[in-house]
Amino acid sequence: FPYTTLFRSPALRRLIDGGRELSGMDYQRILLEAQRFTGQVEMLLYELDLLLAPVQPYAAPTHEQLSSLALDPEANRRLIQFTAPFNVSGHPCISLPIGLTEGGLPMGGQFIGRKGGEATLCRAGMAVQRVSDWHRLRPQCLK
């Protein structure tokens, strides 16, 4: 796979190279784990309309922090730990602003829905926005 301008990011290059190092058995184990997780989420959503989870374990990183995260695999893993699993399982999600930190950085939450349940997610998102003003808040640097 040739590197093009699109793939010059060090973080993306590291992901591609990491994928090249996986054996067929490793890949099969990953696929089985993804299927197991998807089944667990399906079982939860059989009894619930939605799941609520944070988008990330801390406030949105600054631009400088985001640039350095790309070079730190563990920090990058923490950044996506609450969103990536649902990218793998294929469950629709909607992220919503849930406020600002004392320092004025945005924080986000997400609803996770049943497969094919995008309408329910949109209704839930609209309900949150009707009773809050979080979606109108702006960081100080944007005011």
Where are these regions (language model features)?
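Small-aliphatic-rich amphipathic alpha-helix that forms the alpha element of a beta-alpha
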Residues: 40-43, 73-96
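An anion/phosphate-binding loop that grips the pyrophosphate of nucleotide cofactors and donors
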Residues: 48
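Short glycine-/small-residue-rich Rossmann-like dinucleotide-binding loops
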Residues: 56
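Short, surface-exposed loop/helix-turn segments at secondary-structure junctions
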Residues: 29, 60-80
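Structural helix-boundary/capping segments
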Residues: 28, 88-143
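Short helix-loop capping/hinge segments that flank enzyme active sites or metal/cofactor-binding pockets
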Residues: 4-38, 42, 92-105
